[in-house]
Swiss-Prot record:
Protein name per its UniProtKB record: Vibriobactin-specific isochorismate synthase
Pfam families given in the database record: Chorismate_bind
Keywords: Isomerase
Organism (species): Vibrio cholerae serotype O1 (strain ATCC 39315 / El Tor Inaba N16961)
Position of the signal peptide: none
A single GO BP: vibriobactin biosynthetic process
Family label: Belongs to the isochorismate synthase family.
The gene coding this protein: vibC
Record pathway: Siderophore biosynthesis; vibriobactin biosynthesis
InterPro entries (alphabetical): ADC_synthase, Chorismate_C, IsoChor_synthase
Alphabetized PANTHER family for the sequence: ISOCHORISMATE SYNTHASE ENTC (PTHR42839:SF2)
Amino acid sequence: MVMKREVVGYTTMSEHLIDTQLTRSPFFFASANQSMLGCGVAHAFQQAIPFAELANQAKQLLQQAKRDECDNPLLFGIVPFDPKTPTRFMIPRTLYVSSSPRLNRPAHLTRQVAKLISSPSGEQYKQGVSHLLNMFHHSGLSKVVLSRAIEIATEQEIALPTLLRSLLAINHHGYTFAASLDEQRKLIGASPELLVAKRGNYLISNPLAGSRPRSQDAQENAQRRASLLNTAKDLHEHGLVVEEVERIMSRYCRNLYTPMVPSVIETETMLHLSTLLEGQVSDPEVCALQVAADLHPTPAVCGFPRESAYQAIRELEEFDRGYFTGMVGWCDARGNGEWVVTIRCAEVGSHQMKLFAGAGIVDESLPQSELEETGAKMKTILAAAGIELNDVLTA
């Protein structure tokens, strides 16, 4: 079955296709430059496989599409945090592409009344942080990302097109996505973190680690930005991530450039330390997904060393992350692609939402501060949906 590609105006994408196609679309993915929406499924794969096999499996699916007389098909995928969870790849029957719409925030976002279905207490999360701090003194662990999840139910139906447009409006410089999990649920998010992109012969990665909640007061926000760049704990946490990403990127790049000091980027709710790594690929045949699979999961969402952090997460987190802190993105038959870290996301149904957030725990972490960080991160999706749960996010 041939994949058809159609370029449309950004108004058509944002005002027509998102409204009429999103609910049954297998995926939507937007970066700062372009938006893509798939309709129908020409080829699909869903199976738990080792991350080392991701690139080969994607190539097989893309080759099937090329045999259908499509010169450069595009594959969309969601990859889990744990390889025991199925990876999902699909190639659409029709791919709509536009420049990314510059949407304004909704003037009057309908407020949703929501109630908690399940939520671990803040004390429980802080106990997990304290347990990790004790572990650091007698193990080889340097960092563990500890996460939590909350489930809520809403009185009114959650309008997926409205939620997605709200995220697009606050995420001009990041990556906004929606992927079908089943007939009832979608994975929707607004990630600020680029795991890797390949454009021709160039590779780019933009790891984020070290965070503060963003303040609406300009003076306070400036102080928080300065604090991020001047606090040993945050610089140490960020350095662990950058060092590991640089080590892996150097396998694939020549002339790899890594800035010596980080900068600060802002999202709607957070400030993050950021480092942009750029290089030329040594082998033009390398595909974006191969590099992404080697990087995944970075210390920004798992910890360091990787396997020890995995084990600590399995012991301390009482829920299955699923696709949270996995990766979501696309690649084409020529090896180009963009893969982003699946954060600031939720599993969304018609009247239910499961939200996730995590914080990087290092030796200098404070349990209450880490709890507040996870609450601030959850506000990205909650605010876009018109839901306020401030009291339960940090208690």
